């Protein structure tokens, strides 16, 4: 271990560190697999490549707390060879992120319709990151939720809770017929905030 550590110290890139250690490069997400580490090989062809990705989901624009316009984001996605973009700005409960109230949702949808006409066959999907409230309800009425192509449901408030409370909120959100995706399931913020406890098996 010490001899390998000495070889990789000061390497400018991960690839160079592996090269210095006399090992084939192994992507970070595969390094916890003991079989791959001990065999020093893996099937690179089996990995998802950039060209396999057809679209980008869960994007915030400058309509809420994002930095760029929807048009800028769509054009950038097109340049990357993407076929679609899912705009999922923050919902109205996320006041700290300029979340969208109902009238802004309708305004944004009209704007997306215009962009889709200009950019077709590229497609911008209408989405929202809807807050899961303390009782597990989403923060829009069904009449608004029904207007989205897909809804990402996320917990952003009251994060310090028991597993029982967390599961109640998450399962209520899942049972909402308009929920498509759960966002950041445990609320964990890497290196700065622990997640709340959940029963992954039950959720799956």
Residue ranges and their predicted role:
Residues 1-49:
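Acidic, metal-coordinating catalytic segment for phosphate/diphosphate chemistry
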Residues 32-133, 158-159, 181, 185-204:
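An N-terminally biased module of ancient metal coordination in phosphate/nucleic-acid-related enzymes
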Residues 78-79, 140-148, 172-178:
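Acidic (Asp/Glu)-rich catalytic clusters
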Residues 106-109, 138-150, 203-204:
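Short, electropositive alpha-helical surface patch
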Residues 134-144, 170-171, 193-197:
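Distinct, well-ordered alpha-helical segments
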Residues 148-158:
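Aromatic- and acid-rich polysaccharide-binding/catalytic face
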Residues 161-163:
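Short, charged, surface-exposed secondary-structure boundary motifs
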Residues 165-189:
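C-terminal, non-catalytic macromolecule-binding modules
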């Amino acid at each position: 271990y010490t001899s390998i550590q000495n070889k990789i110290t000061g390497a400018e890139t991960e690839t160079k560190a592996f090269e210095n250690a006399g090992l084939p490069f192994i992507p970070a997400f595969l390094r916890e697999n003991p079989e791959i580490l001990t065999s020093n090989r893996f099937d690179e062809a089996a990995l998802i490549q950039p060209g396999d990705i057809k679209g980008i989901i869960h994007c915030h624009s400058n309509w809420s707390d994002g930095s760029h316009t929807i048009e800028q984001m769509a054009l950038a996605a097109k340049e990357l060879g993407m076929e679609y973009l899912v705009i999922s700005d923050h919902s109205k409960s996320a006041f700290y992120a300029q979340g969208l109230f109902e009238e802004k949702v309708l305004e944004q949808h009209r704007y997306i319709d215009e962009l889709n006409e200009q950019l077709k066959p590229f497609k911008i999907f209408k989405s929202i990151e809807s807050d899961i409230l303390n009782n597990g309800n989403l923060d829009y009425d069904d009449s608004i939720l029904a207007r989205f192509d897909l809804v990402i449901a996320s917990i952003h408030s009251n994060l310090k809770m028991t597993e029982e409370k967390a599961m109640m909120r998450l399962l209520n959100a899942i049972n909402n017929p308009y929920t498509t995706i759960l966002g950041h399931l445990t609320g964990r913020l890497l290196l700065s905030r622990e997640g709340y406890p959940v029963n992954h098996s039950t959720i799956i």
